Amino acid sequence: MATFKDACFHYRRITKLNRELLRIGANSVWTPVSTNKIKGWCVECCQLTELTFCHGCSLAHVCQWCIQNKRCFLDNEPHLLKLRTFESPITKEKLQCIINLYNMLFPINSSIINKFRKTVKQRKCRNEIDRSWYNQLLLPITLNAAVFKFHSREVYIFGFYEGSSSCVNLPYRLVNCIDLYDKLLLDQINFDRMSSLPANLQSIYANKYFKLSRLPSMKLKQIYYSDFSKQNLVNKYKSKSRMVLRNLTEFTWDSQLNLHYDLLNNKDKILAALSTSSLKQFETHDLNLGRIKADVFELGRHCKPNYISSNHWQPASTISQCKWCNVKYAFRNMDWKMESMYNELLSFIQSCYKSNVNVGHCSSIERVYPLVKDILWHSITKYLDQTIEKLFNAMNPVQVNDQKVISFHWQIDIALYTHIKMILKTEALPFTFTLHQFNSIIKGIVNQWCNVSELDDLPLCTEQTDTLVRLEEEGKLAEEYELLISDSEDDD
């Protein structure tokens, strides 16, 4: 086990480039960090162990030893983890780059074997070629990769992932890309590598190679917002942002293929990039569709629909003395935009309900309560129109000129009054609402702070470092830019 880690340790002294690239945290002095009881393969050292969340992408893919290097596969520094990373589509040319990388960093020949034999030959018991002392020579070249699926984008991190484990809680899945290359050609490459090994090590090498190179691929797992760590979220002014650490270098490459070309033909550039790299902290907004869905689910779970039957004039989120309407505790960490939406939505529904249904107190038990929760839960789904229509019909609408209408004469907040006028584009509010108007008002309240159709599916921490640098230069990392205020504000 941990053949890749052992190879990084022993091969680091072969060349100057190896000394820089093969310095991984798993072979350094351990700095204790907390684990998350998620067992899987660390994508940096490839050992099967308990994982913790990465500082760069907030996903659980790094072990408690490698975390101290603060490296991420999304960095633009050409460290070993970055060199083993490719984005889809995977081509034969990209796979050849991985094979060339292994052959360059982990060569197997008679001189290398003699070098390790001299290093190991300290006592009589170590004279014989034994697996326990020469595990670093048993690193076959396979095309297995840990794949992160960010919706339409897939990131492949190639490595030698030994052992077996449940992948239920892992953000990635292991796939085998050998069918995209050439099985017989890869077999020949490995036969040539193992030809210099002693006979007893050859059999172990061959067994390892065929065992892993013929593994079937797993079905890819879509990454969701729940896969990301909450430990690096910062709550400022009731608005969340995420702290991200990335390794930067002044050198740039047009593509990953050009980076590998320089690795083979211009090693000085790679060494210069490694020596001049720096660690930079980005503060990115956390406004995305995944978080909105999570917040909306929490809103629906904590919602107290009894408020629509009450006589409370205070905003729904501030009620603290009423046992039927108190949700103040639920908003302690909630985004202020969600709180604003909750207040306006319940205040509007309260006004409509009290105007049309004979109800006196928030202790009343009404059949309409589940529909209020459904409005929140379906606010960003295709079922919102159906739910709004059900809520409208529950308010005893009457038929007027071939249209169903509900009465509207209950008190509302001045800010909500202004907002409804803006949504309906009218100078004065009518005393009745049609289903179309009722639908427009609820959708206007839901979409006032962010247009769900224009939000990214995942947080910005999944973007490449070059993208984060560009967004920071353009001033677009902060949430103020990404609020995506609806066009209704421009209509005043």
Swiss-Prot record:
Spell out the residue ranges making up region: Important for cytoskeleton localization.
82-176
* A biological process term (GO) from this entry: symbiont-mediated suppression of host cytoplasmic pattern recognition receptor signaling pathway via inhibition of IRF7 activity
MF terms (GO), sorted A to Z: metal ion binding; RNA binding
Q: Provide the residue span(s) of the region labelled Zinc-binding domain.
A: 42-79
Highest rank taxon of the organism: Viruses
- Sorted alphabetically, which keywords does the UniProt record give? Host cytoplasm, Host cytoskeleton, Host-virus interaction, Inhibition of host innate immune response by virus, Inhibition of host IRF3 by virus, Inhibition of host IRF7 by virus, Inhibition of host RLR pathway by virus, Interferon antiviral system evasion, Metal-binding, RNA-binding, Viral immunoevasion
Protein name, as recorded = Non-structural protein 1
Q: Which organism is it from?
A: Rotavirus A (isolate RVA/Human/Belgium/B4106/2000/G3P11[14])
